[in-house]
Amino acid sequence: MPELPEVETALRGISPYLKNFTIEKVVVRQPKLRWAVSEELITLKNVKIVDLTRRAKYLIIHTEKGYIIGHLGMSGSVRIVPQDSAIDKHDHIDIVVNNGKLLRYNDPRRFGAWLWTENLDDFHLFLKLGPEPLSDEFNAEYLFKKSRQKSTALKTFLMDNAVVVGVGNIYANESLFICGIHPLKLAKNLTRNQCYSLVNTIKDVLRKAIIQGGTTLKDFLQPDGRPGYFAQELLVYGNKDKPCPKCGGKIESLIIGQRNSFFCPKCQKRG
């Protein structure tokens, strides 16, 4: 599943080919995604793109008339291709612009979404989202206050988009390992010092992943077709039974909140 660094990488990759150009038309071959493609998007024509941004794992294409909201789902990807490019299997949507290029959305599992809104402030999927992890709003004091009275596993807590957006499974695992905190530790038992360490580590891990183009595991490719390279630096994620890079012990795994979790029982004591 593309996480925040992958979406940020996609955003940076597609922006130069879309910003300040005009959408000539939108071609929708398969409207049945996680939610039906918005009718306003299907009929969109001759509208200028003025900006592209990201909120959580949503791509936002700002136009003169409103906003296109894209989510890559479990296996979706976007790429910039010439308008005469051959259509591949699972190429569901093309946003055609007036520079000879188009933005093509491919999604084998069809868990993504492409929606339209005229007002971002009232967009229903954004109303309960927490702060961006790389923003100043996400800080140690915020995390400490948010974690009080939360009797949930820390890893589950960090992956809650109402707490902070975009800290997905891969990056939660990596951050907890670096901080030496067990993923099953109750959120309410976090100390202020641990919150400080976690916030700084999450920001650092995400920044490094963005610089390296995101994590390539199964489905993610950058818009130009190159893979992300952060997977080469993963310390614990996907490394069950391999030696811990800190102590040499064996990395273990367990299921937390229906997601695979990886940790070193020696370096990450439960408490």
From Swiss-Prot:
Chain ranges of zinc fingers (FPG-type): 235-269
Keyword annotations from UniProtKB, A to Z: DNA damage, DNA repair, DNA-binding, Glycosidase, Hydrolase, Lyase, Metal-binding, Multifunctional enzyme, Zinc, Zinc-finger
GO molecular function terms noted in the UniProt entry: 8-oxo-7,8-dihydroguanine DNA N-glycosylase activity; class I DNA-(apurinic or apyrimidinic site) endonuclease activity; damaged DNA binding; zinc ion binding
Cofactor binding note: Binds 1 zinc ion per subunit.
Pfam families given in the database record: Fapy_DNA_glyco, H2TH, zf-FPG_IleRS
GO biological process: base-excision repair
Binding site for DNA: H90, R109, K150
Catalytic residues in the record: P2, E3, K57, R259
Catalytic reaction annotation: Hydrolysis of DNA containing ring-opened 7-methylguanine residues, releasing 2,6-diamino-4-hydroxy-5-(N-methyl)formamidopyrimidine; 2'-deoxyribonucleotide-(2'-deoxyribose 5'-phosphate)-2'-deoxyribonucleotide-DNA = a 3'-end 2'-deoxyribonucleotide-(2,3-dehydro-2,3-deoxyribose 5'-phosphate)-DNA + a 5'-end 5'-phospho-2'-deoxyribonucleoside-DNA + H(+)
InterPro entries: DNA_glyclase/AP_lyase_DNA-bd, DNA_glyclase_Znf_dom_DNA_BS, Formamido-pyr_DNA_Glyclase, FPG_cat, MutM-like_N-ter, Ribosomal_uS13-like_H2TH, Znf_DNA_glyclase/AP_lyase, Znf_FPG/IleRS
This enzyme's EC code(s): 3.2.2.23, 4.2.99.18
Cofactor list: Zn(2+)
Quaternary data: Monomer.
HAMAP family: Fapy_DNA_glycosyl (MF_00103)
PANTHER family per the UniProt record, alphabetical: FORMAMIDOPYRIMIDINE-DNA GLYCOSYLASE
Function text: Involved in base excision repair of DNA damaged by oxidation or by mutagenic agents. Acts as a DNA glycosylase that recognizes and removes damaged bases. Has a preference for oxidized purines, such as 7,8-dihydro-8-oxoguanine (8-oxoG). Has AP (apurinic/apyrimidinic) lyase activity and introduces nicks in the DNA strand. Cleaves the DNA backbone by beta-delta elimination to generate a single-strand break at the site of the removed base with both 3'- and 5'-phosphates.
Family per record: Belongs to the FPG family.
Protein name: Formamidopyrimidine-DNA glycosylase
Gene symbol of the encoding locus: mutM
